[in-house]
Amino acid sequence: MSNNPNNSGQPNKTQSILQEVDKVKDVMHNNIGLMLNNHDKASNLQDKTASMSNNARLFKKQTVTIRRQMWCRNMKLQLIIIAVVILVLAVILIPIIMKFV
């Protein structure tokens, strides 16, 4: 019976196949673990992206508000400067005009 080619390699072949199955199982377990880890990272990245998007929207809204406020302040300052210049010119020119009239 030991000379029969069909039976002589069966235990080694079965053991070899079982070892390969174990290796494939280990690889699949590692792949599943990596996949779950990548899923968690992608989920965290998605949360951070949503948060950054909200922050960007808020930042844009605040900058528009501040830009309007600064424009109004600038206009007020320019009007005050123009009024002061007109007042100074009036103070200087009115006495001169009154002398010649």
UniProtKB/Swiss-Prot annotation:
Residues 13-73 form the v-SNARE coiled-coil homology domain. One of its GO terms (molecular function) is syntaxin binding. The keyword Endoplasmic reticulum does not apply. Coiled coil: none annotated. One of its GO terms (biological process) is vesicle fusion. InterPro entries: Synaptobrevin-like, Synaptobrevin/VAMP, V_SNARE_CC. GO terms for cellular component: plasma membrane; SNARE complex; transport vesicle membrane. It is a single-pass type IV membrane protein. Residues 98-101 are vesicular. Its main location: membrane. It comes from the Eukaryota. It is found in: Cytoplasmic vesicle, Secretory vesicle membrane. Keywords: Coiled coil, Cytoplasmic vesicle, Membrane, Transmembrane, Transmembrane helix. The keyword Iron does not apply. The chain crosses the membrane at residues 77-97. Involved in the targeting and/or fusion of transport vesicles to their target membrane. Belongs to the synaptobrevin family. This is Synaptobrevin-B. It comes from Dictyostelium discoideum. The lineage of its organism: Eukaryota, Amoebozoa, Evosea, Eumycetozoa, Dictyostelia. The gene is sybB.
